[in-house]
From Swiss-Prot:
It comes from the Eukaryota. Its main location: cytoplasm. GO terms for cellular component: cytoplasm; nucleus. The keyword Transferase does not apply. A zinc finger (ZF-HD dimerization-type) spans 35-84. GO terms for molecular function: DNA-binding transcription factor activity; transcription cis-regulatory region binding; zinc ion binding. This is Mini zinc finger protein 4. Inhibits zinc finger homeodomain (ZHD) transcription factors, by interacting with them to prevent both their nuclear localization and their DNA-binding properties. It is found in: Cytoplasm. It comes from Oryza sativa subsp. japonica (Rice).
Length: 124
């Protein structure tokens, strides 16, 4: 007797990427992804746990090539390395999109000259 296998697909959109969700939640802050130490378990077949000493992902090739996803230090794929999102604070006055995302708030000039002139006008 043959068994039948039914494959179900979800109609929902895929969940957002974690890095994009963090950047969106921070209100327009800039985020950069860095890959840390390698977490590949080389002794998984034997039931043990052994990792190599690779401390940071170094791409073998340029961005857009196959070598960009392979580590030059340990030879592992980039997905074996720990993903770290480095959040950087961006000046909201640099982009019009950030002002629109803030709900119409007006942003002051962030340059040091304008802040010093604004403080001198309020002091007099």
């Amino acid at each position: 007797m043959m068994k039948r296998m039914v494959i179900l697909r979800r109609c929902e959109p895929p969940p957002p990427q974690p890095a994009a969700a963090v950047v969106a939640a921070m209100g327009g802050c800039c985020g950069r992804v860095r890959y840390g130490e390698c977490r590949r378990n080389h002794a998984a077949r034997m039931g043990g746990h052994a990792v190599d000493g690779c401390r940071e992902f170094l791409a073998e090739g340029e961005e857009g090539t196959g070598g960009a996803l392979r580590c030059a230090a340990c030879g592992c794929h980039r997905s074996f390395h720990r993903r770290v999102v480095v959040v950087q604070q961006c000046c909201a006055c640099d982009t019009a999109a950030a002002a629109a995302a803030a709900g119409g708030w007006e942003w002051r000039d962030c340059s040091p000259e304008s802040s010093s002139s604004a403080s001198s006008t309020t002091a007099s």
